[in-house]
């Protein structure tokens, strides 16, 4: 199954909120612009299919994680961040380990029809990252994903070493807050243009997961234009809720 490459979310070292030339403080952003709705409940936890579970952990236990310490951005709402990740104890840094192309292709082949059935629309795979390693002190700031390519997504939980689990903060279309916790074998299907993050600082040695992303098969410029004025980064829950109180 072909995978479409997504656009970069930075341009000339400067954050771009959605489409190029649209920054987080662009005066055209409007609280009246909200994300599309595909499902009454925009997230669902399932179990990773056995054939993917076995392949994932066969690869995982042989991986070496590399630190990604470059590319720190000075975000106007989050401060210092790498890919939306801050750290309360040190400069932001994350780790990464790639998985095989064969696993990514197999995962898209298996997961795509599952996400299509759940969302009710035909999808086109866009991008998958390897396994992301969040170190002690990490905060994943509240955000929406990239409207060109990250419209429907899934999180595959991989591993953690920590005294407590680490919640994903997810806000549905009515802006209700949900905490989602993961254990081995858990997968979260979610509408990734809904606001989400992990706002409680992580305490532990590491937390690891991976992401797969899709866009609707029909998602041309006229649909993107509809959502280009949608704000996609927020300092915290209060900022997010107050922003939409304007409507």
Residue ranges and their predicted role:
Residues 136-194, 206-210, 215-230:
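Catalytic core of non-heme Fe(II) oxygenases with the double-stranded beta-helix
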Residues 194-197, 202:
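Short, charged beta-turn/beta-strand-edge "cap" motif at the junction between a beta-strand
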Residues 2-118:
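Non-heme Fe(II)/2-oxoglutarate
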Residues 86-97, 107-167:
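Conserved double-stranded beta-helix
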Residues 90-94, 198, 209:
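Short, active-site-adjacent segments that bind or coordinate small-molecule cofactors and metal centers
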Residues 45, 70, 124-126, 189-190, ...:
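A structural signal for short, well-ordered beta-strand segments and their strand-loop junctions
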